[in-house]
Amino acid sequence: MPRSPLADRTVVVTGAARGLGEALARALAGRRARLALLGHEGAALNALAASLPVPALALEADVTDATALRDAADEIRGRLGRPSVVVANAGIAQGGPFATSDPVEWRRVIDVNLTGSAQTARTFLPDLIETAGYFLQVASLASLGATPMMSAYCASKAGAEAFAHSLQAEVAHQGVAVGIAYPAWTATDMIRHADQFTAMHELRTHMPAPARTVHSADAVAARLVRAVERRRTAVYAPAWLRSVQVVRAALPPVVLRVSRRELPRLDSGRPLRATGPLGAGGRADRAAADPVDD
């Protein structure tokens, strides 16, 4: 296998403790990159770092906390060298009707997925300018078309896409490339938890056949890492998602038609309810953002 352009370069991955972030870390380690793994779950991060065949640094940091990110960046530079690739992967979700959602939980999704991505970019942009590096914003299928019962997540991922497009145009002349990743449904704890709620499971399974398929985190990560090696401006996982860009303006009427048909049926028995933070990552974020004194 030819030597990867990522070999011996320092790569930062946020949200690295589990799911797609963990899969990205393992795929990047296969390219012999030095890895800085950021997230909330210290034990999981440390275990992941210890299992990798490359230098790896596990750091607990909240992507919405500018001071924590600056401290992490200083430690990364001191122990692994200046980062030349940053993957803004940290993300959380909560589902259910907007009208009865918890305003604090709703806003937290925006803060982590959008503001946290921007704060990550702000922290490491000097390094990327110095190294003519690459920033990958992990967006989502939800960036291409919003769905009901996921208003905060869809808004945050649409915002993250727009932020990355803007940043892409701002820093290109400085030698920094910015890419946007559009993963479809990925087999993570977040998705498994969401599928336990009848309304969310049925809304997903009523999507067209290709769009409702859940893909393995390893397969998605492999595709994203190939895009990082090539400094792509966009990467779709799976590849057919690129075609959705052409028809994305037609998606809202389709979603509206399906929702008008399905939501009354789903709401006729047990009323639709908020899910709270989805998955172990969501619960870890809530615990870190609102610690309870012993």
Describe the predicted segments one by one.
Residues 31-47:
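Conserved glycine-rich Rossmann-like NAD(P)H-binding loop of the short-chain dehydrogenase/reductase
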Residues 140:
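Residue(s) in the substrate-gating loop at a strand-loop-helix junction
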Residues 10, 15-18:
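Conserved glycine-rich cofactor-binding loop
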Residues 121, 156:
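Active-site helix of classical SDR
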Residues 173-239:
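SDR active-site lid
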Residues 61-71, 103:
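The beta1-alpha1 cofactor-binding region of Rossmann-like NAD(H)/NADP(H)-dependent oxidoreductases
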Residues 97-98, 102-110:
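Substrate-binding pocket helix/loop in short-chain dehydrogenase/reductase
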